[in-house]
């Protein structure tokens, strides 16, 4: 029996309730991730690879909200493995925020992860054949304003028994040659991709199989392997592809959509493609015809998946992504270069095999560690504004909103919407 859009929608929404969203502005399949809200606070107080006060130690145990009293580059040798029910709030770091450089991260079985405003840059010294970020199993995760780059296999991939994941407002960039892949998004459990930038990946921008919502993304300078690739024909896929902008770059030699088949069912609407590499943004809408979408089976009814609150036009999506995607509280040198490539509209961009071509991870202002008398993760001056006690560790108490006071403070540091 072929699954209809309405049946797929019912199945996919069984999990989706009116529960508190992960943070104001959380959307999609992963919007209800809980993170470490029912656990304890852990303050990352140094840039060490391991040991007390390190980020690696912070995420090694379940049930933690992780905040930062220091900014800068954390250089790691081995992969970081994240436990269940962990919230990582990179926007709390002083200075220019946090970059983690040198190897990748595993979120396999990291149920209920919430990750915001952090840069994960693997690099050629990372583990061979591994992703910069990967999820092989797990459920209920959301990644917001994450900048991930330089994977040695995929840059950000989701495979296996995975359900209810959102990647939003993020940058997935420069998988290293010779593989150079944006990532696989291959699960029947539901993945939402909203307002992201895929850039300088030879292929898999992304490669999709299963249940997927792909809305208001920008894809720039994919190589000969392909832009948005439809997954294999050995199983059913049911996707929405809405309001995206594809822009050819110097390395682009194939069309935006490839490898469609009769089992890849897609609802498509208002997707733009600028293919001429002339330095001017002048894309046009792809007609709703299977030949424009790599031979996908196009359906007329949109799958009723958890959607964005407001769908942008492709032009507005491009403006949004170039202004705000990635760890954009403070843009580092890498993301600044990547956005400049997009805004060259075909005249700049490169597939790379060595992050040195981008200047490496770069330098970050570490900022000044704020005074936190009770050590509960909220600086004293912020406690005064919140009405909490700077002499009592009360940051994990619940506010009337349902969030912990720690989350309320962290959420106040960044906009919930950029509309």
Curated annotation (Swiss-Prot):
Pectinolytic enzyme consist of four classes of enzymes: pectin lyase, polygalacturonase, pectin methylesterase and rhamnogalacturonase. Among pectinolytic enzymes, pectin lyase is the most important in depolymerization of pectin, since it cleaves internal glycosidic bonds of highly methylated pectins. Favors pectate, the anion, over pectin, the methyl ester. Residues 261-296 form the EF-hand domain. Ca(2+) binds at residues 274, 276, 278, 280, 285. Keywords: Calcium, Carbohydrate metabolism, Cell wall biogenesis/degradation, Glycoprotein, Lyase, Metal-binding, Polysaccharide degradation, Secreted, Signal. Its cofactor is Ca(2+). Residues 352-395 are annotated as: Disordered. Gene3D superfamilies: Single-stranded right-handed beta-helix, Pectin lyase-like (2.160.20.10). It is found in: Secreted. The keyword Repressor does not apply. It catalyses: Eliminative cleavage of (1->4)-alpha-D-galacturonan to give oligosaccharides with 4-deoxy-alpha-D-galact-4-enuronosyl groups at their non-reducing ends. One of its GO terms (cellular component) is extracellular region. GO terms for molecular function: metal ion binding; pectate lyase activity. The active site is at 204. It is an enzyme of class 4 (lyase). Its EC number is 4.2.2.2. Belongs to the polysaccharide lyase 1 family. This is Probable pectate lyase C. Glycans are attached at residues 48, 164, 201, 282. Residues 373-386 have a biased composition (Acidic residues).
